[in-house]
């Protein structure tokens, strides 16, 4: 019965699938991640040697010795790690201040408790070096025995002796370097002696021995040298060791960089050990036992080699310290010429060429493997694949060596402020060795080589399983073919010629490694009897398996074959003379080829070692040198400590800052230079941290080192993401700014010679933005997500800056604000191709504080500017349709205080300094006025809601208080000052007389002190408010028309097509509709959408179609609202005495406005500002709006004082000076204002189409009898008061 699964369980199982990482199309621009996998190490260290009983007993015995020596070498490595990673404990332990201190005993007890385990390590180290020296000297003594001198010693055994020499050199230098070891032991010994822990004589003696051992410089080196000098003939054996190292170095018989450097160190230290009173290496050179010229060339080409970690050594220094040093024997090393290892640029062209060749070959092979499946590749194919793998490992090793050797040379040759001007005088030693010791070209070359190493490592690791299988098959086939086939001929001759030693060696080789088809050697093989094969040949079928030889098996085969071709064989003559030349060549070729098999069989570890650049981070040697202190200023040259009298500051620390760390130096160099060709390599230097952490865990096995790597990675990666995000944002912001920049403006700039970098160069950020799982210290980091978070914040800042910049400027900044937001929108669009950014409109709303509030910062600032600056200080000119700032500030309010925008980087504005200058010039032309561009920008930025809010506030907070406040008070006051009656004088008086008449009657108004200041200012504010609303509506209408035209295609609205004479427009229209049917929103949504979606689409379509068609007008509503504010009786005055119209009485507003118009029509003197300059046309608009809304337009045009003067002057054409007023000039001004008033009236009447005003289309006509002269009214009963007449009729 099947188990029932609930829906909840099923859903949870599905959700788990989200955690599975699926392969994606992420570009590979990072190193090989370190996987946590099980690795099988088949190196048995000769534990299975007893299984090869068929081998020569001598070599099995040698394997036993080998195994013991390897154990000592491993132990020596552990002691080297212990010394190198030793951190001073005594500095962290409190010391008693005086002998009277009460807790002195407690402190000493704790000191002993803490340091005792560490001191035991030092004791074990002392015991180990004694044991290792005894074992090494014992082997040397055994091999230098008179009976053994001519015996064959294998290259593997000589190499092991060389490793011992290297180990002694490393341990000795580490012991010399580590003063913290001595300090800690001194602290322990002082505490132990106080507590009497070391009471017995043996312990005291061992403590004394350890103290002397640690304190004596070069103790291990000198002990080894003294021990060897007591052995007769040791120099011959060491000569063999040195020669094998020279041979292997020159023929590149090594694979990992560590082995290469070990060979060089053995040459130097070996020659130092050989040179003594009894042996002169110069004489050995003369006897051709060693070749100093070859070693001299090696030492010059490789002047400095890594000793251990960040400790370096110049091998030639050993020669300089030797007893018989003769510089003439070392011409190259003694010269002052710089070593080739110091110049990476020399190696770079060859590295590039090798990289391109190998990568193309590897790519071809990879493609072949992935596209074709072969169950059993041929021997030739396996051989080619194995050679490909070997060449790859050799190239990686060579490139890694170049990097580490350059780094080593630089550490040993720090720069100073004389060589590098950028290096400060007070720079630290480590800082001078790393931070300031590389040129920009060297850093780029280093990055490129590291990228090649790590990139090739990734490619090879990807096909590791394929390569390993081919390697095993190839090694198996070559070994079996050689053993079963190639060795038949030398075996036949050895049997035939009765060369028993050669026969026994060859038979041992075959019995040790042959894998016969039937499980045993053919008994009828003629070779065993020394006979020739039959005419048909003797067929041996060699099997083909996917398995390689064991490490002991390979060692036995190679050693026994080497004994056949070696110059030493233990007899009077070498065995090689008894072997045929052709066979000798085959054996020699096999021996050389098989040297690399152990590396290839352990392909994964070898690949990792060949690419290991971990030592570029380690700095234990320099930390030891500085003791974790930074001397900021000390005027005396000496060993600095806390007792320095001239010391200003001394900072204690346990690590160097990241600015001195090579991985970050290289990473930061790419980020600082922004070099496009290097940008895709930026993750490779960070992989050095992976190497260092892996080395700390697997080789050093120190948690604190890993913790320090991790801490630096945390800091560096944060810096990396921050800097990279800023760069990416700046790049795309600059690109957006360049795209948005006016093309004609750019062209004009180029013509004038102002050349700014408009379009940024392509920096290849796209590849980095696609990185979703960067591997760092075992963490999978979504770089895309981290960059997205920061760029989201940058976008918010950029939009915030744009709005803040607008808030810091006047109303003219609205155009620049729109441009900034559009540039940000373009930047957002460009970045959204790679990043999941927040919605741009949402960002704008958030920055504008408009998410929940009805109006945002932009709307608020627009109103603030309107209220405190624009309406009160700007003058409108209908000819240009613009507002400009008034020349004289007549506003009673204080000047508006604007906050300055925050200071931010250039890229937050337009993208770059050059673009900022260009846009400042471009938008500078909009700062001197407020016109159509500004109103269109307001419409687009404020939207319907913002515009409604602004207009509503203008009406409530500006217009209404003005009308019912200051204007009403001024009107009441001036109505009192107006003459009770002011007629229209007859034409017979002439225009000068009419002017004099009005001048006399309107003296109080003309001389009213506040007329041209506060009164006109109030009218200007009112008029500007009305004009603003009108222009906003006009701009909004244009925007809506534009929207309609854009939407027409999606609403099945097409322009009438052009038709020829015989064509029917209906047919062509239908074809157009069919062609664009897929774009029709409503019809498509109705077909494929839900009923609700269809309804929404239809409503949206209807709203779009009829938005302008229904003829809605904001301005009409505003005028009606203003009309509702004119409810005071003073505006209309008392009812006319004649019941019809006030003709001569000055009781209505239009008569007051006529008087005010008379005032501002009076020409000013030459130095005075005109009313137009001071108040603009807002003044005229205010009066005209009030006249129209009060229904007084016709009577104003008929009874206006100025218009009457104009009419009379047109008749008589006179031009006189009437009490200082030039009549002709005044008439000209009146005419201009008359035209302006007419234009304003026509605009207002156009909008007030549905009211009862005098300008309405439908006129309400009332018929009245003609008026009579007052002199005849009393005698005539013809004329009656209309009101009384109505009453009589009603009655």
UniProtKB/Swiss-Prot annotation:
The keyword Transit peptide does not apply. It comes from the Eukaryota. Disruption phenotype: Flies display pupal lethality with defects in axon growth, branching and pathfinding, synaptic length and organization of the neuromuscular junction. They also display defects in cell morphology with cells exhibiting a starfish-like shape with multiple slender cell extensions and loss of actin filaments at the cell periphery. RNAi-mediated knockdown in gamma-aminobutyric acid (GABA)ergic neurons, or specifically in the anterior paired lateral (APL) neurons or in the antennal lobe local interneurons (LNs), results in feeding-dependent socialization defects. In the embryo, expressed mainly in the gut and in the developing central nervous system where high levels of expression are found in the CNS neuropile. Expression in the gut diminishes as development proceeds (at protein level). In the adult, expressed specifically in the nervous system. One of its GO terms (molecular function) is RNA 7-methylguanosine cap binding. Residues 1271-1291 have a biased composition (Polar residues). It is found in: Cytoplasm. Keywords: Cell shape, Cytoplasm, Developmental protein, Differentiation, Neurogenesis. One of its GO terms (cellular component) is neuron projection. Residues 1270-1291 are annotated as: Disordered. One of its GO terms (biological process) is regulation of actin filament polymerization. Plays a role in guidance and morphology of central and peripheral axons and in synaptic morphology. Also required for formation of cell membrane protrusions and for bristle development. Plays a role in regulating mitochondrial activity, energy metabolism and membrane potential which maintains normal gamma-aminobutyric acid (GABA) signaling and ensures normal social behavior. Interacts with Fmr1 and Rac1. Component of the WAVE complex composed of Hem/Kette, Scar/Wave and Cyfip where it binds through its C-terminus directly to Hem. Belongs to the CYFIP family. This is Cytoplasmic FMR1-interacting protein. It comes from Drosophila melanogaster (Fruit fly). The lineage of its organism: Eukaryota, Metazoa, Ecdysozoa, Arthropoda, Hexapoda. The gene is Cyfip.
